Amino acid sequence: MPSPIHVIGGGLSGAEAAWQIAKAGIPVILHEMRPDRSTPAHHSADLAELVCSNSFRADDAESSAIGILHREMRRLDSLILQAADCNRLPAGGALAVDRQGFAAFVTAAIKASPLITLVRGEVTEIPADWDQIIIATGPLTSETLAAHIKALTGEDDLAFFDAIAPVVYRDSIDMTKAWFQSRYDKVGPGGNGADYINCPLDKEQYQAFVEGLIQGEKISFKEWEGTPYFNGCLPIEIMAERGPETLRHGPMKPVGLTNAHAPTVKPYAIVQLRQDNALGTLYNMVGFQTKLKHAEQIALFRTIPGLEQARFARLGGLHRNIFLNTPKVLDMRLRLKADPRLRFAGQITGCEGYVESAGIGLLVGRMAACERLGESFVPPPTTTALGALLNHITAGHIETIDAGPRSFQPMNVNFGLFPPLTEKIVSPEGKRLRGPEKDQLKKRLLSQRAERDLEAWCTAPTCGPTPLAAE
């Protein structure tokens, strides 16, 4: 019998990792600090407790990236998707679950596994004699363990709050109004002097935009989050409240830029978007971290010239979320470069969302099991949802864009993380498509490619350890 692998954290990611390891015939010790020590957001001692929404979002694999991820995890015998399907509630096209039933299902499955030992109690540091560890403690990692992780990774490599700017699909930006240009045409590392997409506003548009920011309905911080405002990362609406011209001297300053469509007309303000992933399919709105409610964000940001038809891969936010600078401190197998005994899984790696966290837990569990058994593991192709998500958090970000370093930010799975299609998007008759019709077909083709490629990966011996026939 192989020696056990320790998994710290009994949330969705930790439970999934433990399940995958046990399915490979390897003993697991799963550590969960609750109920000995709880958090302000948890209310029970169950594993995989859902502390926010009870929705796993869209379940349609033909038109949503998260639906593709659901499909892939079902194919790979995910405990979390089993629990969700067995506790499903009516929610239209979404996968919503009964919280208590879901958590009880996961807890019962973990306790019933003869290869998983559930240990209740806080882990405050990593013992030297543990040779394989997965840390899956999530956004509410205890202060003591967070301090230990911080010491292992370096003070600058563990963030305690997300400052999320909205991310827009590049192909939804109207380039008849927007243009590419870096401020003063500056060429930075990896750039060409035209690294930003610029959207111009006249005075009337700017004033209406500022008013919309101030009057828009905001999301309040949860009591346990506190208010983490600091000058380097203020929500854009807080900046707007400091004075009507503040944004024109901050993220919306128009200096050093010339409207390529109207060179003689000086914009009153400019919104800049910066490439957000290596594929160039996603662009983030620079300096636009916000606590506006999502519907308010969509309506207001679509008043910006060039973004009238914008589709958002992610909307802005600011909330507590402990996460690593994964591309810097972890390797491609999510092992800590400074101490390869340690792997990380879930939200602490920089993925965002219940299912994404569980998906990374699934992969990390398989990676750890293969390593314990001396087997090879090849990650799923980047054309799959699991592969695209793993690639983004390990290698898909933009490390530098101008003179300064680029911060790594968490991301949900979305179609912008998938490599572009190589074939032309045309109707069965060969007709060129536009607008929503083109977008729908593109999603179907990406979904079909993901399904084919995942199936091919699943049949290869390097996709993970062979599950036990029965437990």
From Swiss-Prot:
Its EC number is 2.1.1.74. InterPro entries: FAD/NAD-bd_sf, MnmG-rel, MnmG_N, TrmFO. It comes from the Bacteria. FAD binds at G9, G10, G11, L12, S13, G14. GO terms for molecular function: flavin adenine dinucleotide binding; tRNA (uracil(54)-C5)-methyltransferase activity, 5,10-methylenetetrahydrofolate-dependent. Pfam families: GIDA. It is found in: Cytoplasm. It catalyses: uridine(54) in tRNA + (6R)-5,10-methylene-5,6,7,8-tetrahydrofolate + NADH + H(+) = 5-methyluridine(54) in tRNA + (6S)-5,6,7,8-tetrahydrofolate + NAD(+); uridine(54) in tRNA + (6R)-5,10-methylene-5,6,7,8-tetrahydrofolate + NADPH + H(+) = 5-methyluridine(54) in tRNA + (6S)-5,6,7,8-tetrahydrofolate + NADP(+). Its cofactor is FAD. It is an enzyme of class 2 (transferase). GO terms for biological process: tRNA methylation; tRNA wobble uridine modification. One of its GO terms (cellular component) is cytosol. Keywords: Cytoplasm, FAD, Flavoprotein, Methyltransferase, NAD, NADP, Transferase, tRNA processing. Belongs to the MnmG family. TrmFO subfamily. Catalyzes the folate-dependent formation of 5-methyl-uridine at position 54 (M-5-U54) in all tRNAs. This is Methylenetetrahydrofolate--tRNA-(uracil-5-)-methyltransferase TrmFO.
